Amino acid sequence: MAAKKSFIIKQKLAKAKNQNRPLPQWYRLKTNNKIRYNAKRRHWRRTKLGL
């Protein structure tokens, strides 16, 4: 990644960073909750963003 990034690229990186986190524990404790984990987690080395 270049040191000089355009603002659009920086925004996309920030969004990807925010999306790449586990589910909050309080959300798992909700009644009738079927979701156990974040299926869209991304590992920095395995899957690239394709920017």
From Swiss-Prot:
<dbReference type="GO" id="GO:0003735">
    <property type="term" value="F:structural constituent of ribosome"/>
</dbReference>
<dbReference type="InterPro" id="IPR020083">
    <property type="entry name" value="Ribosomal_eL39_CS"/>
</dbReference>
<comment type="similarity">
    <text>Belongs to the eukaryotic ribosomal protein eL39 family.</text>
</comment>
<dbReference type="GO" id="GO:0006412">
    <property type="term" value="P:translation"/>
</dbReference>
<keyword id="KW-0689">Ribosomal protein</keyword>
<dbReference type="GO" id="GO:0022625">
    <property type="term" value="C:cytosolic large ribosomal subunit"/>
</dbReference>
<dbReference type="InterPro" id="IPR023626">
    <property type="entry name" value="Ribosomal_eL39_dom_sf"/>
</dbReference>
<dbReference type="InterPro" id="IPR000077">
    <property type="entry name" value="Ribosomal_eL39"/>
</dbReference>
<dbReference type="Pfam" id="PF00832">
    <property type="entry name" value="Ribosomal_L39"/>
</dbReference>
<protein>
    <recommendedName>
        <fullName>Large ribosomal subunit protein eL39</fullName>
    </recommendedName>
</protein>
<comment type="subunit">
    <text>Interacts with YIH1.</text>
</comment>
<keyword id="KW-0687">Ribonucleoprotein</keyword>
